Amino acid sequence: MTKSELIEILTKRQAHLKSDDVDLAVKSLLEMMGGALSEGDRIEIRGFGSFSLHYRPPRCGRNPKTGESVALPGKYVPHFKPGKELRERVASVVPLAECGDITE
């Protein structure tokens, strides 16, 4: 699901809200979450999961084109840990790519 699809679905489910208001709410939420993570804060949404930063230490990489070794600096990357309720909800789901041909 893309951000545009999410906005469209929310607009249909909440008919009393204007599409522009839903668009603003979704974009504001994502902006606030990105801002919190960029300040090093942890975001926890009970039943869904938590977002935090994980440190990736410096390492030696390789330029795939030349094969030359390249020193890569350490960095922080976003990390999502699903909550218990979300894990239970998706435990029995089979992704469409693994289902094979739907017409069978």
Curated annotation (Swiss-Prot):
Pfam families referenced in this protein's UniProt entry, alphabetically: Bac_DNA_binding
Organism domain of life: Bacteria
Keywords assigned by UniProt, alphabetized: DNA recombination, DNA-binding, Transcription, Transcription regulation, Translation regulation
Gene3D superfamilies: IHF-like DNA-binding proteins
Record CDD domains: IHF_B
Entry GO CC: chromosome; cytosol
GO molecular function terms listed in the Swiss-Prot or TrEMBL record: DNA binding; structural constituent of chromatin
One GO BP annotation of this record: regulation of translation
Function: This protein is one of the two subunits of integration host factor, a specific DNA-binding protein that functions in genetic recombination as well as in transcriptional and translational control.
Similarity comment: family membership: Belongs to the bacterial histone-like protein family.
Self-association state and partner proteins as the record states: Heterodimer of an alpha and a beta chain.
Protein name in UniProt: Integration host factor subunit beta
Organism: Xylella fastidiosa (strain 9a5c)
Gene name as annotated: ihfB
